């Protein structure tokens, strides 16, 4: 006999602890949940009267009969018609109330102890001579449960375990049932390092002694049956031939296998050895399945066989039936069909019922229109001839897509071979685009056009290049490299011509006529084009923050006459995703590695677009020295700029040699070598306010390239800026960059100062160089060139909160000569007088309001 440890009684069917249950259990009571349907009251009375809930409908009918006989007592407590009420109460879908509880108390001669949430019970005495009571738990949802003492539940758990063990051990004859229950429900209580076992003469394990006092008796193969469907897969039972049930199972399986072999046409001489699922001959199949992590029977069955765990079998069965009915959407004991229901119809003079679909039902439910699948037409049948579908013929609908993510995923097959392994880099392996991409599906574009801007520029250039391709082919001798690339270049050439879009303005393509001997004009390589209209024949100057802004350092002028842009503004967006700042000159300190894309040399021999050199021996490089020298020099210059050093041969091209900062240097030498279109990044003018968009003449500051500084080293800047001298002059405040700008949220009481950047010769790491240029700052003044209109007076079209530019703070003193032709060491009066401005457009109107609060 098995010896087990003492444990407190627990509930095996409750999924989560209920606070009401915990309150009752702390006081020695146990709440047994009943099915949450309309018959909960009658289930409680049937269980407490007859120890089963299966008689709940009979209890309902007895209650209705008793209330009908005692009509004079219960009629006054029922609102409305008493007969209609009794007729509805006889139906299973009508909820019972306190009136029915009183009637059944009088019927069965018992008083009631009514429990409510957080209440120890209220005794309702109908007659003092009644010796027993109904213990009912009631909540506000019109639901009733049974309440028992904990001692009663302990005895019920023992009886339940005995009943299930008799079923599985004596009827099914499964081996080692008690041991399997302990392993499944209490695996943490086993200490396999300390235990004793006993063996018989044949080597079978017959008993296990645990250190905590538990003793488990193990079964022998002759007294049990195999848990597997085919006992031949279990060496524990297949070696014993005295099993009648297993022999019958094996005989049926053997006959079935022989029939399958005959049907398939095999000779029947195949080896009959099957891979055993339980290979150990001295260990039972149940223990071997447990060792493999397989449950020999459901956990609910194991809970029912545990004497210290009570399982609410009635509630579990009802819950399973409810889930099954909800899953398969079947009518269970209900003939209340709806339109669209799939059911069976009983036709006259037919021996079997046919599957049909309800199309229409009359209001009185006397007849209905159904579509019969067998005959393929719609007929009218009586409503009583409809019957629910049997469970084996019902096929549920497909689950919605939102439930698919909860279903198990199908495992993807693993690719065999070396493709599944992590590939290692080899230097002798080079990337060939032809091996991975098709030419017809791979188009390499230098930029991404938005709204087809400047379309005529590239279309005309392609057309001119197409006309000149045959002549270039005649002039250039054939080489091995051109012979290899000629077929691919022709395919690319044909595809480019086929996918070419016709220009919208055909007259623009006829303005230029190119002769056969003349070289085609270079393509205009541009990264950004401001969204402002420009006059014909003039390309808008780039802002200093753009990659084309360092004109002093990289003087690559665009050769040829630029093509006129369209009248409306347009943009070429680069692949980097950095949008252009608003038009206007924005300061940027020091040289940076961003540079414009220069035009290639015109005397390059070859066909089609240039390609990358991939061969290790360099056989795919151009044969002409001009192209090699051009790109080699470009790489050397890029290397110097990436390391943030100045190339030795370009020192004379700079407009300055030191950082232009008067706050840190007492004196400097200014080298004037810039023109009108090439402004340095340090001495550029901040963007103007939109209020001056209607001005007709630019400020003199825009026409001057350099501004000399005040070399007064005695001046000390305080916390707040000093009062400006000669405030009526428009040149001084317009170029006064370190002047703090008032914040719009502080009403002019707070100002933003700009910090001094690091010198240009400071070494910066390459990752920092690849960052995009900083956004433009916010300047709140009214002097400057014409700007876009459309903004309100006193507002700025740019968003507040943008970071300040990295500039060198400096001042331009009044009467300082801004003319580029002047000498850098001399101060001369200004030769160009500014145009008279209105009072509202003068800088004094901007700074006076915030400085004199």
From Swiss-Prot:
Bias category Basic and acidic residues: which stretches?
460-470
An example of a GO molecular function for this protein is:
deubiquitinase activity
The Tudor domain covers which part of the protein?
336-396
* InterPro entries for the chain: OTU_dom, OTU_OTU, OTU_Tudor, Papain-like_cys_pep_sf, Peptidase_C85-like, Tudor
Q: Give the EC number(s) under which this enzyme is classified.
A: 3.4.19.-
Give me the stretches of Polar residues compositional bias: 747-758
Specify the inducers: Expression is cooperatively activated by Ovo and Stil.
Spans of biased composition, class Low complexity? 499-517, 783-794, 820-838
Tissue specificity as recorded in UniProt = Expressed at high levels in the ovary, at low levels in the brain and fat body, and at moderate levels in the gut.
Cellular localisation: Cytoplasm; Cytoplasm, Cell cortex; Cytoplasm, Perinuclear region
Q: Show the Pfam families listed in the entry.
A: OTU
Q: What does the UniProt entry list as the effect of changing residue 37 to A?
A: Loss of deubiquitinase activity
- Assembly and partners? Self aggregates, forming amyloid-like fibrillar helical structures; protein aggregation is mediated by the C-terminal LC domain, is enhanced by RNA binding and is essential for deubiquitinase activity. Interacts (via OTU domain) with bam (via C-terminus); the interaction enhances otu aggregation and deubiquitinase activity. Together with bam interacts with CycA/cyclin-A; the interaction stabilizes CycA by promoting its deubiquitination. Together with bam interacts with Traf6. Interacts with Hrb27C; the interaction is RNA-independent.
Protein name listed in UniProt: Deubiquitinase otu
> Which species is the source of this protein?
Drosophila melanogaster
Q: Quote the gene name from the UniProt entry.
A: otu
């Amino acid at each position: 006999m098995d010896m087990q440890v003492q444990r407190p009684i627990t509930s095996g069917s409750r999924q989560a602890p209920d606070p009401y249950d915990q309150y009752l259990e702390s006081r020695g009571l146990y709440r047994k949940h009943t099915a949450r349907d309309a018959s909960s009251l009658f289930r409680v009375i049937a269980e407490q009267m007859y120890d089963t809930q299966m008689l709940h409908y009979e209890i309902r009918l007895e209650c209705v009969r008793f209330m009908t006989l005692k009509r004079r007592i219960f009629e006054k407590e029922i609102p409305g018609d008493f007969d209609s009420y009794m007729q509805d109460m006889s139906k299973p879908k009508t909820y019972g109330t306190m009136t029915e509880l009183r009637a059944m108390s009088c019927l069965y001669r018992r008083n009631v102890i009514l429990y409510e949430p957080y209440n120890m019970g209220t005794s309702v005495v109908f007659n003092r001579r009644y010796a027993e009571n109904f213990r009912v738990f009631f909540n506000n949802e019109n639901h009733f449960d049974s309440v028992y003492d904990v001692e009663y539940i302990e005895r019920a758990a023992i009886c339940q375990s005995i009943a299930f063990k008799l079923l599985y051990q004596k009827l099914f004859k499964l081996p080692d049932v008690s041991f399997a229950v302990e392993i499944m429900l209490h695996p943490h209580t086993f200490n396999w390092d300390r235990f004793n076992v006993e063996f018989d003469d044949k080597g079978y394990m017959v008993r296990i002694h645990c250190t905590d006092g538990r003793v488990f008796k193990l079964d022998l193969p002759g007294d049990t049956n195999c848990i597997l469907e085919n006992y031949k897969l279990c060496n524990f039972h297949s070696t014993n031939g005295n099993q009648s049930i297993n022999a019958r199972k094996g005989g049926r399986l053997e006959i079935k296998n022989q029939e399958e072999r005959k049907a398939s046409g095999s000779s029947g001489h195949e080896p009959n050895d099957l891979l055993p699922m339980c290979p150990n001959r001295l260990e039972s199949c149940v223990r071997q399945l447990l060792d493999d992590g397989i449950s020999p029977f459901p956990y609910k069955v194991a809970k029912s066989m545990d004497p210290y765990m009570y399982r609410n079998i009635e509630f579990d069965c009802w819950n399973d039936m409810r889930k099954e009915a909800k899953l398969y959407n079947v009518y269970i004991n209900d003939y209340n069909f709806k339109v669209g229901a799939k059911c069976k119809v009983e036709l006259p003079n037919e021996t079997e019922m046919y599957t049909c679909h309800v199309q229409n039902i009359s209001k009185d439910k006397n007849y209905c229109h159904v579509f019969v699948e067998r005959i393929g037409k719609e007929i009218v049948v009586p409503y009583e001839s409809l019957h629910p579908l049997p469970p084996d013929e019902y096929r549920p609908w497909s689950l919605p897509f939102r439930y698919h993510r909860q279903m198990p995923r199908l495992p993807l097959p693993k690719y065999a071979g070396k493709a599944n392994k992590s590939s290692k880099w080899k230097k002798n392996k080079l990337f060939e685009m032809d091996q991975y991409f098709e030419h017809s599906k791979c188009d390499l574009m230098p930029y991404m056009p938005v709204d087809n801007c400047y379309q005529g520029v590239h279309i005309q250039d392609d057309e001119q290049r197409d006309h000149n391709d045959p002549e270039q082919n005649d002039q250039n001798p054939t080489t091995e490299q051109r012979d290899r690339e000629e077929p691919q270049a022709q395919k690319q050439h044909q595809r480019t011509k086929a996918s070419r879009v016709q220009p919208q303005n055909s007259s623009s393509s006829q303005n230029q006529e190119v002769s056969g001997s003349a070289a085609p004009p270079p393509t205009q390589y541009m990264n950004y084009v401001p969204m402002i209209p420009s006059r014909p024949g003039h390309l808008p100057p780039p802002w200093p923050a753009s990659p084309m802004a360092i004109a002093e350092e990289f003087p690559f002028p665009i050769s040829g006459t630029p093509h006129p842009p369209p009248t409306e503004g347009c943009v070429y967006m680069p692949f980097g995703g950095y949008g252009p700042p608003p038009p206007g000159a924005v300061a940027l300190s020091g040289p940076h590695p961003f540079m414009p894309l220069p035009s290639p040399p015109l005397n390059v021999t070859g066909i089609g677009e240039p390609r990358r050199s991939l061969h290790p021996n360099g056989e795919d490089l151009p044969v002409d020295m001009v192209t090699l020298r051009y790109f080699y020099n470009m790489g050397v210059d890029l290397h110097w700029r990436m390391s943030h050093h100045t190339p030795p041969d370009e020192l004379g091209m700079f407009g300055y040699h030191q950082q232009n900062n008067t706050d840190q240097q007492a004196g400097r030498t200014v080298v004037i070598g810039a023109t009108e279109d090439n402004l340095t990044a340090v001495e550029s003018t901040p963007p103007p306010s939109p209020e001056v968009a209607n001005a007709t003449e630019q400020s003199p500051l825009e026409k001057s390239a350099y501004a000399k500084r005040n070399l007064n080293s005695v001046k000390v800047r305080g916390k707040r800026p000093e009062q400006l001298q000669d405030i009526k002059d428009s040149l001084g405040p317009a170029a006064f960059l370190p002047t703090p700008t008032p914040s719009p949220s502080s009403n002019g009481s707070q100002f933003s100062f700009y910090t001094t950047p690091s010198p240009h010769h400071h070494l910066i790491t390459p990752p920092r160089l690849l960052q995009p240029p900083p956004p433009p700052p916010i300047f709140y003044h009214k002097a400057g060139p014409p700007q876009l209109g459309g903004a309100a007076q006193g507002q700025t079209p740019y968003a507040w909160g943008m970071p300040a530019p990295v500039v060198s703070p400096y001042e331009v003193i009044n009467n300082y000569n801004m003319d580029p032709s002047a000498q850098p060491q001399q101060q001369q009066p200004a030769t160009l007088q500014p145009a008279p401005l209105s009072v509202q457009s003068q800088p004094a109107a901007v700074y006076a309001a915030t400085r004199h609060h």
